[in-house]
Amino acid sequence: MPEMKISFLGTGSGTSVNLAHTAMVYDCDDGTRLLIDTSSGDSVARSGSDLGIPVESFDKVLLSHHHPDHMSGLMFVQFVRALARPDSPPLDVYLTEESLDWAIKMCSANYLNVAEADRQCAKNSDGREVMRWTVVQPDQQVKLGPATTAYCFPADHI
């Protein structure tokens, strides 16, 4: 039977001051490592470091929804990853249409290694893709690894 290890990097809600905001790491037995939600600020880096999970180990991010306590750490995750692995492929980000709108706004609002963003990807100042967007729909299945599939469902909060 397939196994999966789940590490909680944050379980706090938007108003939480004592807990990092929502972020979870799924390590699947096919080698797929998936970050679900990116918390806020540098919480993923701090909590991940405590558990031996470096930010640069993420190649795939799935954002549950567009609230800042679930996705505002995205820019920091891709920035730290790009510093540690400058030649790595783009960070694959799976998100809803509404979350994509907010992700593009976040890219425009800060300059952590992103010079431009459109509905396909975010690029650095050299024109290199640093994040690639995949919009997902409710009831869609998304292949994330050799034996890892995500099943998307309508949700306004997790």
Language-model-detected regions and their locations in the chain:
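Binuclear metal-dependent hydrolase catalytic cores
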Residues: 1-158
